[in-house]
């Protein structure tokens, strides 16, 4: 179903009259306006074979939280699946922090694997939990910026 949904979205974004007859979805001629002025990137999440195949055909992949070795295996598999497909400029590997790599070295390893965007809770690296006051979270973000981000640029 997801593959058909993505195909339908791209058809509708064309701004032209389109119709569709698939295994799961069917519709007669219609158009969706206003059409996007430029392509909308499609990032696909998941780590099952169908999800990785789908991600390989689109603009990027969004991981779950994995160990560093699991992430490396998944990115390797995804890169293999992308071989032979039309290459998209600026393919995105969007990662939730690896649970075993909360350090400058760990974030550096994720960057070296090709991770282009990282999602994390930087204050948690310093022992501040989600229910902590905002000031403590901001302090954790500043520390993360100075100790991790600045050193990885």
Task: Name each model-derived stretch.
Residues 1-153:
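Active-site-adjacent structural elements that line small-molecule/cofactor binding pockets in enzymes
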